Amino acid sequence: ADLHNHFVLGGSREYIFNKTGYKIKSITTPLKSMGEMDSWSSKYIGNHFNSPEGRKLLIEATFAQAKFDGVTVLEIGEDVWGLGEFFDNDIEKIILCFQEANARIAPEIELRLQIGLSRHCSVDYLMNCLSHFWGHKEFYSIDLYGDELAQSIANFIPIYDKAAENGLVLKAHVGEWGTAKDIITAVELLHLNEVQHGIAAVQDENVIEYLIENNIRLNITPSSNVLLGRVSDMAHHPIAQLYHRGVDVTIGSDDVLIFNSDISKEYLRLYQSGCLTKEELDDIRING
């Protein structure tokens, strides 16, 4: 399974090149900030895919990459702002776009359609966008991402209360740039089922115990953590300590086009670095 994948940056560079002749280079040395990551995105993604057709191509490329890696469950979805930008505020267009690419390119993959929220956006704006999404059972989960320091996580309580009413799995990016305590705060305020990243939990034994007792899953992306400077190297990635303590963890790709982080490579890197054994990695794979 790949339960942490941002489809805009999650696709196969080979698929994109074959369709467009455009080469996208991944980064090879750690970045110093999210700003540097945004600069990379502007350079290599920018306006190249800033159209309905470009968006559809990126969706197709993500299914192509997942198929190549043998992924069986893929959780991806559009950011709410994309509904008006690329799909004429027609929610059925978004749903059908993902479903059609799924059926045509990788019908063997279970698609879990996700609603994406950018943390820097105002809650009023997000609620307005979300009015188109509520009530559509095709959506499986909701995820909040972006700058963890952009605004208080408490601001998003009304959104997550509504999402819970709609039966969505509740997720958010926390504990990548923030603290271990931020993870508990987010889980308690938003009633999260899963946390994207959450690696800061390793800093606090009480937080680790909390995650275990409350069955909170962490969907962790190792190469992303290393290349964004959140972890010193793969051999010492905190996923090992969290797994050994009994925290529910999965391995995700995050942004394949940036980090060259295909799921198969993530498992291989964790094994080759000595971070986790093949038996431990297989256990994580099956659990995911």
List each language-model region with its residue ranges.
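Metal-cofactor-binding active-site regions of metalloenzymes
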Residues: 1-168, 177-181, 189-194, 200-217, ...
